[in-house]
Amino acid sequence: MSEYKPRIADGILREKLEAIGAVLVEGPKACGKTTTAEQQAKSVLYMNDPMRRMQYMQMVETDINTLLDGAVPRLIDEWQTAPQFWDAIRFTVDHRDGDGQFILTGSAVPVINNGQIEHTGTGRFGWVKMRPMSLWESGESNGGVSLSELFESPESIGATSTLSLSQLA
């Protein structure tokens, strides 16, 4: 397995965990949600584990709190396969002391108030939106040009790149 490359989202996730009970990390498939969350999680539940998936789904229906037990922050990966996690985590956050209890990751987010999720999560959940790695995160750019600087003062931007156009594409 390759070495973890730090992401901009690492700091954002850390800040959210220090401020709220649960954090939902969302974004497209394969953008690094699980890997990023694993860096800060103290325990992990992989809902898509083929050897345990059926057992986990039965536990969701009979004793979901057992699945929530573990060192915090506890990562629930692919949580959307069992939307019941949302209300169970909201309830747990309300009745435990402390921020940074849960990290939820998944590519799809169920609709609130669809019969499976009863509460919006306001005040209990924070969100981190992830995107695929930027060129700077992947090491393909030195960060000499930033989009925010480009919009703030386009006349003062000046940098060169060793990458060819085909390498950037």
Residue ranges and their predicted role:
Residues 44-73:
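Short glycine-rich substrate-engagement loop in P-loop NTPases that contacts/grips substrate
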Residues 86-110, 118-119:
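Conserved catalytic/switch belt of AAA+ P-loop NTPases
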Residues 1-14:
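N-terminal pre-Walker A segment at the start of P-loop NTPase domains
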Residues 25:
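Hydrophobic anchor at the beta1->P-loop junction of P-loop NTPases
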Residues 114-169:
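Interdomain motor-coupling "hinge/lid" segment immediately C-terminal to the ATP-binding subdomain
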Residues 75-76, 101-107, 129, 138:
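Structural recognition of the conserved hydrophobic beta-strand(s) that form the central parallel beta-sheet
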Residues 33-34:
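Conserved lysine of the Walker
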